[in-house]
Amino acid sequence: MNKLTAIVLKGFRKIYSKFTNKNSHNFICETNPERASEMIYNLLCNNKPCMIARFGSTELNAITNYRGIKNHKNQVLNFIMNKTPQWWWNEKGLEEIFSCSGFFPPTTENVSRFAEMMITDMPQVDILGSWRPEEKFFSKELAHASKIELEILNPYWSKKPWTRALANKKILVIHPFAKTIQAQYAQREKLFNNPEILPYFELITIQAVQSLGGNDQFNNWFDALEWMKQEMDKVDYDICLIGCGAYGFPLAAYARSEERRV
């Protein structure tokens, strides 16, 4: 794509969106924290595999970009009207999925492979923390998912937090700051006024790969992902809580495919 042409097309799209509000996030989703908390709680308590997830910003940008390239090439008018995604590679987006989400190396081949994997995993989502307008480009894949406003995924907004479902369970947490989480959990009774926000459970942790800082332990992001899957397979757990950048969504889908709740 010629750089000048890309600038002009994006300019027209921006003007169109400004006057029509077509780029706003206006999906129907649950905004009441009590109802949202009950939805999550009930899902976690029915003892069936489930996946509660959200998209990262840079990851979804890259996936959307890939979908535009694959399915919507040269659809100028639809692009301007924000009906289809950008159909040429966004160089800034490729940089950001590396610098902000730790995906490496951010080649178009690797990002294409990542996008295909993410799109394949999307139908496994049962509840989606919704916040990005680009979600509309994946309405078919997400048709099964109930949507709640992203912020109220956090349990502390509800008087009856969904985290009470964790009580007396084996809880696996995958996060780069695993040791800090263990130390904080030891002080759990001092952290919140409502004890149901962080009840007693058996805490198991896996230190996630932190590839934002140029971790060279693995040849690529996919190798790091496979290593974390293998670490998960070594653990007996009931529910998994994951917070590890671009690795999070695929690991959650893997846990669900293994008949777990995440």
Question: What feature does the model see in each segment?
Answer:
Residues 3-200:
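Electropositive, gly/pro-rich neighborhoods at or near active sites that engage anionic ligands
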Residues 35-39, 111-113, 223-235, 247-249:
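A short, acidic, amphipathic alpha-helical segment used as a generic capping/interface helix at domain edges
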Residues 141-147, 204-227:
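Glycine-rich phosphate-binding "P-loop"
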Residues 201-205, 230-238:
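A short, hydrophobic secondary-structure junction motif
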Residues 259-262:
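Conserved small/polar residues in nucleotide/adenosyl-binding loops
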